């Protein structure tokens, strides 16, 4: 059976790519930040998506897979570039801009594309192109991202994904693969991962540096989501937003404020690019 790639209007305007061989599909809204709103694997919908909130353009999105660029987290005091101070909103601007979308030549998935604009250069003074290839494989979603610096100066950046995974009950969740310690991003203090996992239903926002993949187990639905990292996109953030029954399992390249602190700060040399890889696997237990 062949794959399909078509534009649809219900329940909202979106593009849908599906692969019947794997009983899998994704929905994408390129004009809303290249947002992947749904990922279905073996017939199961895995992402949390608040449609009512999405339809209210005055509110930020809660759900899908928002794209974080050129920073992850906030940068409250701005940053210096070329002797001038610039300010960026939380998680950057990529999730707010329209992207273009195309079917990959081998039809294994779709390609999203974002380039700088006159407006973006007023707060991020660089010429760039970002290409994100999203491929559906058996029980997995593979995302590879190329970021090109088309400027004459080195381009600092962070990149991340903010996937919302729906769960049956945040009190019935197990997470494996995290280290013992993490940074509580609500107060920027080091704390125990185990203490944070115990209060997922109360709301958490913590960052860690795992040495292997991270697995999210839902004891009621029996779903398992595995985040497979590749350096430098190997920082993991866990975020919950009660009473929503979802857990965000987020791969970042760098912690918040890295453009100022230099902690895991990334730069792309002029006329060069970097390629980043992330895979999400779905299984049952």
Which residues does each predicted region cover?
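Acidic, contiguous internal or C-terminal segments within carbohydrate-active enzymes
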Residues: 17-19, 29-30, 116-157, 162
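Active-site/ligand-binding surface loops and adjacent short beta/alpha elements
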Residues: 154-156, 163-232
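Active-site pocket scaffolds in enzymes
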Residues: 224-285
């Amino acid at each position: 059976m062949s794959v399909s790639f078509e534009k649809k209007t219900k329940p909202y305007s979106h593009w849908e790519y599906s692969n019947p061989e794997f009983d899998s599909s994704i929905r994408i809204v390129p004009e809303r930040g290249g947002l992947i709103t749904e990922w279905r694997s073996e017939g199961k919908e895995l992402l949390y998506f608040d449609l009512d909130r999405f339809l209210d353009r005055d509110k930020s999105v809660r759900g899908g897979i928002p794209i974080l660029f050129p920073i992850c987290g906030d940068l409250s005091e701005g940053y210096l570039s070329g002797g001038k101070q610039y300010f960026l909103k939380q998680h950057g601007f990529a999730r707010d801009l329209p992207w273009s979308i195309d079917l990959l030549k081998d039809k294994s998935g779709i390609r999203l594309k974002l380039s700088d604009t006159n407006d973006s250069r007023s707060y991020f003074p660089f010429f760039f192109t970002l290409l994100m290839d999203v491929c559906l494989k058996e029980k997995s979603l593979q995302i590879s991202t190329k970021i090109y610096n088309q400027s004459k100066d080195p381009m600092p950046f962070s990149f991340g994904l903010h996937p919302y995974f729906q769960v049956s009950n945040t009190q019935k969740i197990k997470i494996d693969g995290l280290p013992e310690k993490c940074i509580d991003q609500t107060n920027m203090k080091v704390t125990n991962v185990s203490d944070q996992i115990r209060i997922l239903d109360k709301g958490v926002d913590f960052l860690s540096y795992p040495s292997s993949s991270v697995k999210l187990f839902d004891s009621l639905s029996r779903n398992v989501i595995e985040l497979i990292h590749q350096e430098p996109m190997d920082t993991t953030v866990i975020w919950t937003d009660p009473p929503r029954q979802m857990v965000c399992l987020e791969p970042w390249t760098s912690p918040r404020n890295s453009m100022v602190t230099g902690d895991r700060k990334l730069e792309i040399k002029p006329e060069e690019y970097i390629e980043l890889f992330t895979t999400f696997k779905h299984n049952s237990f």
